[in-house]
């Protein structure tokens, strides 16, 4: 069965479901790396992507965002010239109660009986003002980091703002 659209899971409608014993198997998140670049270096400028609303971000949107941003910043700064960090983890389990459609579906389908649903993916619960991605760079590569975060935000289901949290005085306009 195909992946449902993200709009089905985007809003936070209720509190997190914590009874994991009912969920048989949780699919692995698609996000492969959470820290990329040079984690041992200290960068004077730090730029963050901040959410403008409360939202659930699916794991495949996070992975897509990571690939887009990391690819750009890697080409601009080189392998050791930046630190790219994803600050959220997809803990929320997304469930789907599959419904049969078509002729004779009423005889096959259970309807709302046993409607708990199967786990189809994971998502990160993000609050308004929470940092999603952080990039650390040298001052001369600030605009490359800003563009990388803009590309990251295009892949996410929420409006985001780019905030300089460290080294604002080092940036030349």
Curated annotation (Swiss-Prot):
GO BP annotation list: translation
Keywords, in A-Z order: Ribonucleoprotein, Ribosomal protein
Entry GO CC: ribonucleoprotein complex; ribosome
Domain of life where this protein originates: Archaea
SUPFAM superfamilies linked: Ribosomal protein L16p/L10e (SSF54686)
Database matches in Gene3D superfamilies: Ribosomal protein L10e/L16
Molecular function, one GO term: structural constituent of ribosome
Pfam families the record matches: Ribosomal_L16 (PF00252)
PANTHER family: 60S RIBOSOMAL PROTEIN L10
Recorded family membership: Belongs to the universal ribosomal protein uL16 family.
Descriptive protein name: Large ribosomal subunit protein uL16
The species this protein was found in: Methanococcus maripaludis (strain DSM 14266 / JCM 13030 / NBRC 101832 / S2 / LL)
Recorded name of the encoding gene: rpl10e
């Amino acid at each position: 069965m195909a992946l449902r659209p993200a709009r089905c899971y985007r809003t936070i409608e209720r509190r997190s479901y914590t009874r994991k014993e009912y969920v048989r198997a949780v699919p692995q998140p698609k996000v492969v790396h959470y820290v990329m670049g040079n984690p041992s270096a200290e960068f004077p400028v730090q730029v963050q992507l901040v959410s403008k609303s409360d939202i659930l971000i699916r794991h495949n949107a996070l992975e897509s965002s990571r690939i887009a941003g990391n690819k750009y910043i890697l080409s601009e700064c080189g392998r050791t010239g930046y630190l790219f960090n994803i600050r959220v983890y997809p803990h929320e389990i997304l469930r789907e109660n599959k419904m049969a459609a078509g002729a004779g579906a009423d005889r096959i389908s259970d309807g709302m009986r046993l409607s708990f649903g199967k786990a189809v993916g994971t998502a990160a619960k993000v609050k308004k003002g929470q940092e999603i991605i952080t990039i650390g760079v040298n001052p001369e590569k600030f605009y490359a980091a800003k563009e990388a975060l803009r590309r990251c935000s295009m892949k996410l289901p929420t409006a985001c703002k780019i905030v300089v949290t460290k080294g604002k005085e080092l940036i030349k306009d």
